[in-house]
Each structure stands twice: as C-alpha cells, then as structure tokens.
Amino acid sequence: MNILYVTSEAVPFCKTGGLADVAGSLPQALAANGDRVSAILPLYERVKDKWGEQLHFEKWTFVRLAWRSVYCGLFSLERDGVTWYFVDNETYFRRSELYGYYDDGERFGFFSRAVTELLKSLPQKPDVVHCNDWQSALVPIYIRDEAVRDDFYKGIRTVITVHNIEYQGRYGSRTVEDLFGLDHGWFDGGTIEFGGDVNLLKGAIVTADAVTAVSPTYAQELKYAYFAHGLENVMSMNARKLHGVLNGIDMQRYDPSRDKSLAAAYSPDDLAGKKKDKAALQRVLGLQERPDTPILAMVTRLVSHKGLDLVCETLDAFMGKDVQFVVLGKGDAKYETFFEYAKQRYGGRMAVYLGYSEQLAMQIYAGADLFLMPSKSEPCGLSQMIAMRYGAVPIVRETGGLKDTVHAYEAWNGQGNGFTFANYNAGDMCHVICEAIDLYHDNKGAYAVLQQRGMTADFSWTRSAQEYRNIYESICR
C-alpha cells in the first residue's frame, strides 16, 4: 500500500507540540510493516537552516491558489525507510515560527493545494493520503473537488486525524473563493460552513473517508459539547467513520538504559541508576538531598486546561506530606507567578523552572517518583507514557488518553499502574496525590509493582501502526 502522510510539523525537523512526535514516529512504524510510506510538510526556515545541505531538490512548479499562481519548490530526504518531502515557498514559510501569523489560513491553504497538485509528481500514486489537524484539512476537500474533473484523483482515499479539536481553522466566508479557490457551493452546501464561517476541520471531517482521534476515549468524548468545541453534532453524525487510535511513543528514544542526558542509566531489572538520577536531580534543582522523600513532578504547559487551578488550590495540602514538588513549564503569567512565590515558601522542598529544556525534562522523568497530570482534557498525552517508561508512577485525571493508559491502583487486589480521579475537583485530586505519597512511604512493595508495570508496558507504535493499517484497508476496499 502507498501511503502519504501530511503534517505541519514532525520530529526531528520541527516541533511545537505532540503532533510532531506522532508525525515523526507513525510513518516510520508503517514503513516497518512493509508499506511504501512518504510524508510531506512545509520547508520552514528552521528546517532549511538545519537540514538544507541534506535535502535533494526534486522540482519547482507553480500552484493554483484561487486567482493566484504561486511558486512551489519540492525537496526530499530519505530517513528511516520514509521519503520525506518538503514544500518550499519562502514568502509563506521563511519565518521564525511555525504558526501564529495573520495569514496562516493562506499559508496552509497554499500548503494543502501544493500537496494536492504534487500528488502527480510522486513516484507512485498514493492509495491513502493521511492528513492531520486543520493545517492540512483542505487536502481531503481539494482531492474530492479535483476528482469530479480529473480521473487521477478518483480512488485516492483520505484520512483526517484530530489531535486537538480546539483548533479548527475558522475563517470568514469570503475566503472560500478568494483565498482557497473553492466553488462557493462547498460553503453554501454546508460542507465547510459552520456558524457562518469557513471551518476547515469540519470540512475534512465531513469529506474524508475516515476520521481518527488520538485515543479511544477522546474519540468518544468528541461527541459531547464539553470536549468538542462546537463540533459535537458533526462528530456524532460522522461516528460511523470515527476511530480512536492511541498514540505511541518512540521506545528507543525514550529508554532510560541508553538516555545520554541522564546521570546514570537504569532498566526495569536494575533500578540502581534511578536512585543516582534522583540524587542528581535534587542537586541540580537545589532540593534537599533526601533519597527517601518522593519527588512529585509536572512537565507541562502552565495553562488552565492542564489542571493548574487544582494544583494551586491544593498545593499547601499535599505539601503537608513528606514530598518534594518539581514543576517544569511555561505559560500563563498567573501560574508562573504562583509557582515562583510557592517555591520561595517551600525552600528546598520545591523547584520551579519556567521555560522548557528537553534535557532537564528527561532528568525530571528519571528522577521523579510520581508524575502529575490533572488535565481537564487530554486528547492522548505522551508525558504519562514517558513518565512510566522512566519509572515515575502517574497520577492523572480520567480523560482522553490518560484514561486509556493509566489504570487506578486497587489496594485490595493490587491491580493498576497508577492513580486516577474522575471528577474535576481539587478534593478528589488531593486525595489521590496523598494516597500515592502514602503508598510510596508505607508500602514499598506495592509501589515497586506499579513502577515495574509502567516501565515494562508496551507503548510502542507497532500496535498503533497496525490499527491505522486496518483503517486504511477498510476504506480502500
């Protein structure tokens, strides 16, 4: 099967969020199963600066974008069994950031149009074009539109994956013809119209042959208003083609036995190195060097939907326990200020790093005993899987992928691999945090079992890739 994976970011080329991790791993896992896989993304400034010398020039052409004819270059790179293509246009992509510009609609409209037209330039016609989020949501629409008058596009199946439905690509109705070059019937007929605006993600959900969400629970949550940001009816009406596929993590990249950023390596069979990593983390962050005190950690964006209001409300309560608390992240000023003041109050028992450091993040995963993710919503979440891989027992709210990957510890039968709470309230969260701290102190054997279950769990992309392969086969029949 020939598969083209369309994304706006991918590790190791460029990253702003979890989409990049998925896009950097899933194509490789699909290729390992024997499929012919290629992936395509914009040639951003940071990609050209770092990878430019390794890129092979394929061709240049002009792309039709409404009334404009726009230059488009195509470059390629072979990596890990996947052919990576890069769409070049310096007007749109020679910028310091990936997103956040006034003309993002035009930028990714061009990208989607370029992908659609460049399908004819690929060595083999793809059977499936797999798109991600609003930035490539126009591709299924363009393919459906072109298939009416060009036989080449007939038979190409499309998939759209929703990583975070909050971001939908909404623009004024005048963009239909003037910016995206579509007949206004796409808007008037309701395919891309929502609330009087153009909604690109809605259009892809309606048009694509299959819709996937990044975890089974998130796929179900998207049918409800609390999670769907207005698109709950659209998701419910398209439920027959909606699938929840849990993301994986790169098990080789996230491996404490070979992670060079750690003070000491360790494995599920030999945890001596983790004790050294804990001591090293305490020294680096200025914490009291106490091996028997558990470290509770968060590596997160400091924004409300990550559950920070619950943490602020209960901090004094759970810090009344024998525990150390570490926070790595940046975000809203009110949370940054709160944690800065809290760090001063708790001295050597609390550390806060406002910003992001990949190396420090890995050192925190390795040094932590408990890992907190009290999110209001979490489509999938990768941090809880990385934490478990590094031997930090997770404490999570039961939502999205957190519910699918972390199962509550049951004292009466010893089942589970972490601690969970269902209701979004401070009391429930504080209760399970205290329960986890008490288990660490009072029942080392039970804690060690939870730790081992997390470290030995299979969070690889192999299973996820096979699920996607099954979806591709079902829509190509």
Task: List PLM regions with ranges.
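Catalytic cores of nucleotide-sugar-dependent glycosyltransferases that transfer UDP/GDP/TDP-activated
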Residues: M1-R477
